[in-house]
């Protein structure tokens, strides 16, 4: 039979695993409170919750002159970094 400490540890690890699997994906939308806690800026764009509209607009302007990679893809670090990472991609990869 497991001790009380063992059961508590097991439940904590189970909750941690569930929380990580729910919020760990890059495509998940985070709440305003979560973004505020991590220093992120809210945005209307689902694929770039940490990127401002100005950053996305600048990315589109930078990529518009590229003959192959003329679509802009903005992403964030799913580990919680508030950095906005924009780069040019082929339109079909968007």
UniProtKB/Swiss-Prot annotation:
The terms describing its cellular component in GO are: extracellular region
In this entry the propeptide is located at 25-44
The record's subcellular location field reads: Secreted
Q: Which Gene Ontology molecular function entries are recorded, alphabetically?
A: ion channel regulator activity; toxin activity
Task: State if 4Fe-4S is listed as a keyword.
Answer: no
Q: What is its main location?
A: secreted
Q: Which residues form the signal peptide?
A: 1-24
Judging by the UniProt lineage, the source's domain of life is: Eukaryota
Q: Does the keyword Hydrolase apply?
A: no
- Give tissue specificity per the record: Expressed by the venom duct.
Q: What is known of its domains?
A: The cysteine framework is XXII (C-C-C-C-C-C-C-C).
The protein's job, in short, is: Probable neurotoxin with unknown target. Possibly targets ion channels.
Per its record, how is this protein called by name? Answer: Conotoxin Cal22a
Organism this protein belongs to:
Californiconus californicus (California cone)
* Organism lineage string: Eukaryota, Metazoa, Spiralia, Lophotrochozoa, Mollusca
């Amino acid at each position: 039979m497991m001790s009380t400490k063992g059961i508590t540890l097991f439940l904590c690890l189970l909750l941690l695993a569930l929380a990580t699997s729910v919020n760990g994906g890059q495509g998940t939308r985070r709440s305003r409170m979560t973004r505020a806690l991590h220093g992120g800026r809210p945005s209307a764009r689902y694929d770039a919750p940490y990127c401002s509209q100005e950053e996305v607009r600048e990315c589109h302007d930078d990529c518009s002159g590229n003959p192959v990679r003329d679509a802009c893809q903005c992403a964030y670090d799913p580990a919680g970094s508030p950095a906005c990472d924009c780069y040019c991609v082929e339109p079909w990869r968007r």
